Amino acid sequence: MKGNVSELLNATQQAPGGGEGGRPRPSWLASTLAFILIFTIVVDILGNLLVILSVYRNKKLRNSGNIFVVSLAVADLVVAVYPYPLVLTSILNNGWNLGYLHCQVSAFLMGLSVIGSIFNITGIAMNRYCYICHSLKYDKIYSNKNSLCYVFLIWMLTLIAIMPNLQTGTLQYDPRIYSCTFTQSVSSAYTIAVVVFHFIVPMIIVIFCYLRIWVLVLQVRRRVKPDNKPKLKPQDFRNFVTMFVVFVLFAICWAPLNLIGLIVASDPATMVPRIPEWLFVASYYLAYFNSCLNAIIYGLLNQNFRKEYKKIIVSLCTAKMFFVESSNEEADKIKCKPSPLIPNNNLIKVDSV
């Protein structure tokens, strides 16, 4: 531990930004990174709290499928309430001066958040796959009790996956990004294992689930003559697209950093100096930025969440109590009700292989 502490202290004493050889960085860079992080923190906290409150208040949104959505929101909140503010402090102070313990806890929680996010996104994809492609079995497999057990399992697997970081010495301060984080160059084998099991394997599972769903969607839409086979409702398709967009954005935001990890792990001594610092920093802050996007996507693409967001904001602005269930009287007057993000009742009764 003493060695790690001395490394941390040495890192904070490097030239601004900690670039190789003490190269100075553009004066605008710290301000830009601080702005990105402040925006991410504010939108992350407000947006994901809106998601959680929306599910809590609205009975239509309070169902077994949305348990995974709430769990994903919690994973995104973790980084906004502790690690990101510490990174922001590091940017403003041009170095880490918060000590070894805060560095380790911050890096641990960052890892917990990202692994929890990808595991929850995988759980959502499996939920959507079962709902659309095996809907006859959906109610039995995804009862409220079972869904809570699945979410508990997701977080247990997340803890198991992140614990080795505490023993491998990979959680260190990186002055290039002003963050205590997973250091890719410490162990090539471990870095490759992390990328494969924490990113590539979950991505393969998610891609498989969504490809099967797209195949079914195309099959349903190509039917010309009416038949007795059930049709895919527009609400189901919109709900599926919402979660598909969440997955695509996560993959886009995190793929560059994981690709860099594989490149670095191939030969740390040779590849680390070859990775442009701007690319490394951009890949990290793109990944950081992802934590604030999901709540925005729900609001843009899902009418039920959007309406509940508005109700909560209006309640706050008018000083009304918002920890109460939303009234369904107004909704009952509407003939065409939009389905929630992940509805309770199956609209498709198809059991495809």
Curated annotation (Swiss-Prot):
Name of the gene: Mtnr1a
Entry's family note: Belongs to the G-protein coupled receptor 1 family.
Main location: membrane
InterPro entries (UniProt xref): GPCR_Rhodpsn, GPCR_Rhodpsn_7TM, Mel_1A/1B_rcpt, Melatonin_rcpt
Protein name: Melatonin receptor type 1A
Superkingdom to which the source organism belongs: Eukaryota
Taxonomic classification: Eukaryota, Metazoa, Chordata, Craniata, Vertebrata
SUPFAM superfamilies to which the protein is assigned, alphabetical: Family A G protein-coupled receptor-like
Glycosylation sites: N4, N10
